[in-house]
Amino acid sequence: MSESGRTILAVNDDPAILSLFDDLLSEEGYQVVLDQFSRTTTDILNDIRRVQPDLVIMDFIIGGEGTGWQLLQAVRMDRTTRHVPVIVCTGAARQVEELSAHLDTMNVRVVLKPFDIDHLLEIVDLVWANAGEASRSE
């Protein structure tokens, strides 16, 4: 169950995936901001700083390179964005497995492509539930 007013920033190099995220998440009541991975990591990080989304959903491997991993590291190292929950939505199962300990430490959820839409929405809801628990413990 979504809450109106929450903003999700989706980052991907595939316009069809961005369109899917826009349609799916908007229908659930979220404000959706789309960011194409054709830009630099710095540009996308600046967008995340500017938008201050409640959640980032991003790809991991772009054009065979680990650009998503670089962006994730930048998000986690930046004091203005490190608090933003991240879901990595990727088809790069091998890379996810290799970096699973790092992803766990960074508190990053992973959804492997191809994904079931209901599963993605369950993970989004889980992120909101965990964010609520974290704010109650602060």
PLM feature spans:
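Active-site beta3 strand of CheY-like receiver
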Residues: 50-62
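Non-catalytic signal-transmission and effector/linker regions of two-component phosphorelay proteins
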Residues: 1-9, 13-16, 42, 116-138
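His-Asp phosphorelay/catalytic-motif detector in bacterial-type signaling
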Residues: 52-54, 80-85
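Conserved sequence signature across two-component system core domains
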Residues: 11-12, 35, 56
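Alpha4 helix (beta4-alpha4-beta5 surface) of REC/receiver domains from two-component response regulators
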Residues: 66-70, 90-112, 118, 122
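Conserved phosphotransfer microenvironments
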Residues: 41, 59-74
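Two-component/phosphorelay signaling modules centered on CheY-like receiver
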Residues: 15-35
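Short acidic/polar segment at the start of the alpha1 helix of CheY-like receiver
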Residues: 14-21, 63-64, 95
